[in-house]
Amino acid sequence: RFLNAARIADYVHIAEKADCDIFITACSSIGTAVEQCQFMTPLQLARIDCAMVEEAIEKGERIAVLATVATTLKPTLDYVQRKVQQSGKSRTITPILMEEAFHALLAGDMDTHDRIVSEGLQSTFTQADVVMLAQASMARVLQQLPSPPVPVMTSPESGIRWLKTLAES
């Protein structure tokens, strides 16, 4: 974590020199390291999953968080729990880890990856009011499914919508 924060600090300094308006990380695994660097800069630092998490907290009491890698699931769950606590709301968070899907992805077997993610996603529809896909690579599965019965949140979609709102203000 220390190395991540030091590396992120270097990137933040580069972003400042480039006169950027915002520094955003698209990787949940380093989101906490990015947050830890906020004290050192007036530049706005953000996580791509921030909007997704806030929207999920607003949309439902039972939140399922799906991931294919434990190193993404844990920091995402920590972040969701922290944001739930800050909101003052009561939410049940159900983690679902599908490591077999990640192994298939590494092996280049996209069909198996997508099938496992699709099955995991569909299994949550009866136990969650809203589902969060913790990795952008999982969002492609949504194109292969009929319209889900509950909202399914992805960080690229929510994050870009948030950035667009920020840019327009």
Regions found by a protein language model. Give the residues of each.
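Non-catalytic structural scaffold of enzyme domains
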Residues: 1-169
